[in-house]
Amino acid sequence: MPTINSPADLERFRQEILAKRSSEKARISVCAGAGCLATGARKVIDAFSAEIEKEGLEKEVCVKGTGCPGFCERGPIVVIDPEQTCYLQVTPQDVPEIVSETIQQKKVVERLLYSDAANNVKATREADIPFYKHQERNIIGNNIKIDPKCIDDYLALGGYSALTKALFQMTAEQVVEEVKKSGLRGRGG
């Protein structure tokens, strides 16, 4: 990673990351948070990687383990972009069907969608699931887009912009005042 000496350096580096990533490349994001890992997410990630390789789709599709999107009771959770198709309780056995149907044929695997118990209405996108629908996801809203082991994912989404502002555009007094106004008190809140 290059040295960042100004906000312009950070923005230039972010643009380089974005340029390397194909916006047309499908992305399979598998929750790799503790809850999903406990229910088999690592095996799901491995199954997707193997299936993508088997089908010769490495240039069209990337597979990422990501942060927790929050709906742990329904994990492992898989989100496929750019369509934002959200599948719940995915197993390695589901992977060939997902790759064939959703990745190759652009069809939805209905049985893996969220289904509202009250009215049996299915939600295709994470944002349409009642658990998420009314949430304002300020802190973990991008978790399903970020591999916690890949700093480029964070930078591509604008990560470190607040730090850059504090370092290069604010005085020490302004930084202290901003922290006081925020109400932050440490790890415990």
Where are the predicted features?
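Feature of Fe-S/electron-transfer and energy-metabolism proteins
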Residues: 1-189
